Amino acid sequence: MFLSALFIIYFLFNTIKPQINHFKAHFNYVEGLDIGSDVKLAGIPIGKVTNLEINNGLIAVTGLINNEFAIPKDSIASIRSDGLFGKKSLLINPGFDNFFDSSNKNITFIETIDSYSIDMFLRYLKNINE
């Protein structure tokens, strides 16, 4: 009886647990994006950034996303802030192409848009005035 109950609990836990896909995107500039930052699809949180590393002169951003959400293959990954000075998140702007195969556990975004900060903008304005 005890083993049956244990098996049922184990089965329920493993079937309820969301399935996860890994993603990778490359950027030139990721200021403010951190490990643990949200990954959003059209503004809805669907995952987290798990690693940032420099790879061949670019910053490779990797993370986990819930595969319950269908992501078109031509989606664009960008880095955005919540408000003017808010924390950064990776935003997936959905495209219109076929969806990534949900059985494929690795998604690579071909097109990305870099993050630009207020600090960069102020430096740009300072250079114009000089």
Language model region names:
Residues 1-28, 34, 60-62, 66-68, ...:
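Extracytoplasmic/periplasmic terminal helices and flexible tails
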Residues 28-60:
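Short beta-strand/strand-turn micro-motif
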